[in-house]
């Protein structure tokens, strides 16, 4: 697969999951940083750890949740070898569970729910932002910003992500 390393395309990482294309990783990171550097970020669907490693260089603390344990174990090992100290990993279902370190300045979700899960919104600090793909067959990239008790939604480009699934895989 190394011969595809410079392609702007999603790549398979096993378990019917993909590493997002580099453009989308950069775009989601750009949106995350648009209004300043968030201190505390929840990443749902950390997969290979690629986006996690980028976030770890840009924010104070990353909480990475992955539902597929072998992917989580592999990314944890790699990021520890690279001496990232500001990432906490958790094996779990980020689509249903409120994270124990909530609330967050930002949440980045790397899988597409059909609609925005309420549990995501509940975990945002005031002025916090949620960046995620939304939709079943046709998906769009969205950013939802919490303004007091209201949520302001912005829609960006059409995207294609794996679906957000419930449950965990050991």
Q: Each predicted region: which residue ranges?
A:
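Substrate-binding/catalytic lobe of Class I Rossmann-like enzymes that use SAM or dcSAM, i.e.
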Residues: 142-148, 152-170
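Conserved alpha-helix/loop element of class I SAM-dependent methyltransferases that forms part
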Residues: 5-9, 15-40
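N-terminal auxiliary segments of SAM/dcSAM-dependent transferases
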Residues: 1-3
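Conserved nucleotide-cofactor-binding alpha/beta core module
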Residues: 33-152
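Alpha-helical hydrophobic/aromatic positions enriched in membrane-embedded helices and signal peptides
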Residues: 13-14, 58
């Amino acid at each position: 697969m190394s011969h595809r390393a410079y392609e702007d395309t999603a790549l398979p990482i096993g378990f019917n999951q993909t590493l997002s294309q580099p453009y989308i990783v950069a775009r989601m990171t750009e949106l995350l940083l648009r209004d300043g550097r968030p201190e505390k970020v929840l990443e749902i669907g950390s997969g290979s750890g690629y986006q996690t490693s980028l976030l770890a260089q840009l924010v104070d603390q990353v909480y990475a949740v992955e539902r597929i344990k072998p992917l989580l174990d592999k990314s944890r090992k790699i990021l520890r070898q690279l001496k990232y100290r500001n990432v906490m990993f958790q094996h779990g279902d980020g689509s249903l569970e409120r994270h124990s370190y909530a609330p967050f300045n930002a949440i980045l979700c790397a899988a597409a729910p059909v609609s925005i899960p309420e549990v995501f919104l509940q975990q945002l600090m005031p002025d916090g932002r949620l960046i995620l793909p939304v939709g079943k067959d046709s998906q769009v990239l969205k950013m939802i910003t919490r303004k007091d008790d209201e949520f302001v939604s912005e829609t960006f480009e059409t995207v294609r992500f794996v679906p957000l699934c419930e449950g965990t895989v050991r």
